[in-house]
């Protein structure tokens, strides 16, 4: 920070600021001064750039002008949102002392720290996306990873075994803020991510972590959570929890448990697969035309977030899946009645988190009340649904009649945004508050009554009651009648023609009225805090209710989608395989203006690989992706876009579909392609679904063909994975003749002159041609270029109609591992010592090598 070294030379106020800033050197400090939050020195310069606000100077301290920038306190949320979106963290420093009684600067302290991963304010969060704080740890045995959604209390840990799995977890969870140890070795894994925070090693100590977690959950050990034997995950979780406590400056009662996420419990998808399948984000980085955009018609934000978690973590437990299927089927006749009521529930999950953090605002409590008011109707509607899982959700959501009654009595119908604005607590809730409000609102009536009463009592017709800003309330009597003033009248002010008095009753009333607004507001704040105390004992049950409501929203939504989009319930089978009748791509069918051409698929242990050929734009990639998406939907318990589906166990989904240069890492398209291919070949199993599209196209024809052949052979013969293998190498269509479990299918097209019509229908057998020139013409390549290409094609076909095919077969794939026969010239050169040759001997060797070549 650009500050003078001599601390004592600063003004008392700046000394206070500098002490607070020294405690938070790496983040911006919002320092409350009256109606503004001020920033000074380097913070002011940074904020002026980040927020586009004016940079000014505030006098001088220690002889130097102080750079300053400020924002109005009532607009702070908008500015915080901008900073958080840029990955910045902010310490909020408030005035906690009373200016009237303070000697020197008003006492101030940092009351909270706003960071990208620990925000809970509604204005700072995207309502339909999780906002995660994460921590990563690494030792010689692997990684530890923990995530916390502070806006819901959801706390998870895992222990990814290798770099690829860790990268997939980072891509799946996409944390807003990531904590890492100062000696973290795999920086290339996290570099470039938003919200990186370097933390000291001691925060990751295992003993500290266990102590922190036991203290948080009120337990003696962590056995009950199933995380006792996950030391790497616990190291990450301990650091994460400590950071959350440090930033919130309060207890975190809504974080009540921690859950271990195990690799074997869900279908694993690496980063490339999530990207290529466009689950929640399309390839351009947006949310349009994704699987979530089709499936997510949930009516609550918390339901939307839960559905996205399901999509990114499909479960393998068929008991869970069958229960979801049964529930979706049972709910299909009730969606029209349930969704309007569920819509009124709102985002109860995040409201409860703010309640736990004691940052809930009046409108949060009003929304909570509104959610409670929907529960009786919801429960009544669900009573008619013949489904045990639905009835379990109905019981779990509860009714909370007492809490509903409390909030109906306590909070007005439409409260202001902030409790400090007053007028939050309803009339009739607290007698003392009503009195203070009556005093503040009813001073005029009281003074009129007092004036009438005192005139009658004293008989003085010139007596009147009034108010003066300097002297307060008074009773005024004309000079001519002042000698008749009662003995209990104490003179307050003498005027030319009148005397002004005060009586104990009026003085007491004056004190009440002058402080009634302040007293009413202070009492209102106290009563508001007491509401938290009355609600928080029910937090656990309320969180269970919110979870049940979110799950109900997801299941009702999937029931509506199944009915509206004509989906079918898939059947799970024990053996590996996928059989699809009339399958459709869930996203493409929604954006097409013409009917989607449905296609079948049959993969089984006896038919493990399909070699897919056909023209570009013919639908090969769509066919492959729809298979993966149907499998993914089945494994979240959803119905699927097909006439009939039977699907066996799946442990992983891999996609090697399309590629682009990774310029940031210095990797070419071909290198990216080969890296993804290597990951598949190392990690796929017989229970994996593998999509391979155009392997080997980034290098020379023979190199690419050889690699594609070897990869296909490895997947079919050794790994035995369920594989869809799209290619333009027609030589690969010979694979079914050379190995078991491989079949050809193709997507056809009709060519007429210079035009081509894509049939988009999958047929058995290999394609007859690739139609590449017709597609090029369709794309607008100049006619003379197309004409020349046709000539060249005829030349090449006449020269070598089947050259590649004669070179590549199942017995010759050893060319990838066995070097070509070395020429005699090369052998002679390898045995030659050039330093020992005379000029004459060198000349002789040149002639000898010439003869060998």
From Swiss-Prot:
SMART domains in UniProt: MUTSac, MUTSd
Ranges annotated as spanning the membrane: none
InterPro entries, per the entry: DNA_mismatch_repair_MutS (IPR005748), DNA_mismatch_repair_MutS-lik_N (IPR007695), DNA_mismatch_repair_MutS/MSH (IPR017261), DNA_mismatch_repair_MutS_C (IPR000432), DNA_mismatch_repair_MutS_clamp (IPR007861), DNA_mismatch_repair_MutS_core (IPR007696), DNA_mismatch_repair_MutS_N (IPR016151), DNA_mismatch_repair_MutS_sf (IPR036187)
PROSITE patterns (alphabetical): DNA_MISMATCH_REPAIR_2
Claim: DNA-binding is one of the keywords in the record: yes
Keyword Transmembrane part of the UniProt annotation: no
UniProt record, GO biological process: mismatch repair
Binding-site residues for ATP, renumbered to this chain: 614-621
GO CC annotations, alphabetized: cytosol
Key words, A-Z: ATP-binding, DNA damage, DNA repair, DNA-binding, Nucleotide-binding
UniProt superkingdom: Bacteria
One MF term in the entry's GO annotations: ATP binding
Reported function: This protein is involved in the repair of mismatches in DNA. It is possible that it carries out the mismatch recognition step. This protein has a weak ATPase activity.
Entry similarity comment: Belongs to the DNA mismatch repair MutS family.
Annotated protein name in UniProt: DNA mismatch repair protein MutS
Organism: Escherichia coli O6:K15:H31 (strain 536 / UPEC)
Lineage, top ranks: Bacteria, Pseudomonadati, Pseudomonadota, Gammaproteobacteria, Enterobacterales
Primary gene name: mutS
